[in-house]
Amino acid sequence: MLAQFLQFLFSGVTVGATYGLAALGFTLIYNASNVINFAQGEFIMLGGMLAVFFTQAGLPLPVALVLSILVPAIVGVLLEKLAIEPVKGAETVTLIIITIGASLVLRGLIQVWLGKGTHSLPAFSGEVPMAVLGATLMPQSLWVLGVTVVVVVALWYFFNRTMHGKAMLATSFNRVAAELVGINTSWVLFMSFAMSAALGALGGILVTPITLTSYDVGIMLGLKGFVAAVVGGLGNGLGAVLGGLLVGILEAMGAGYISSAYKDAIPFVLILFMLFFMPRGLFGGKSSDRV
């Protein structure tokens, strides 16, 4: 029983960390613009697919991984500059619809370019599992967890110890006041999209050796990342990561102990529960009406 529980726990924490990275991407853009970016899932897909493409093209793995983060970050910037900035001041619903359209475009382009097939990426440090109290833990899972911890620490330092980070925080609290004290909020939005896309791509790269990837994986990963952001408290960075871990663990436990047929339904049952009973999330969002 313990071994089985640990196996489900390891699986849930691994995929939950990926949801957490996706949720961080949602949080960054939401804080900067009050927009929920439904193209976030496609950045996860893009990171994994580009990593596969670059490695198959013969590039060393470290170079392939860097490019697979850099390219989606550039795509995120282009999305902000070409689709969001021209309609600055539009209704929030309009901006959300634009991100949905961008999601469809990205998915279609990757389908045409790399096909409909499923692709794999070699694990970063081998595939020999480690035994832990009767359960098995893959080395790639440690990469996912370790990188997620590093990202959380790096973002904490960025937002609390750097001027650029503090400018982004100030904008998230009060955009008008930030502009009045001279903060370039357009630059903040620019950076938010770049960082959000990079975080999504990083999550996709990390999880691809475990779950494989294809042109359409971003839909469900993005939606579950959004669930994680809401569960943790929309606008709360640490809550986004913890929400991702919770969603991943509940999903794995439900699939293991109830039925795998309900695996994808569990996060959406959870978000309905949260919206009805805890609309600000477990750790408190910025305000209940914005959730």
Feature annotation, model-predicted:
Residues 10, 31-78, 82, 87, ...:
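Membrane-embedded helix boundary and interhelical linker motif in transport proteins
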Residues 1-21, 50, 61-64, 90-95, ...:
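Membrane-interfacial amphipathic/re-entrant helices at transmembrane-helix boundaries
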Residues 19-21, 59-70, 190-200, 204-271:
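Transmembrane alpha-helical segments in multi-pass inner-membrane proteins
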Residues 26, 59-102, 109, 242-247, ...:
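Alpha-helical transmembrane segments within multi-pass membrane transporters and channels
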Residues 23-32, 75-76, 80-81, 102, ...:
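Alpha-helical transmembrane segments of polytopic integral membrane proteins
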Residues 48-53, 69-75, 102-109, 147-156, ...:
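Hydrophobic core segments of alpha-helical transmembrane domains in multi-pass membrane transport
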Residues 15-16, 136-214, 232, 237-243:
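Helix-loop-helix "hairpin" substructures at the membrane interface of multi-pass membrane proteins
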Residues 86-161, 188, 253, 258, ...:
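Transmembrane helix-bundle core of multi-pass membrane transporters
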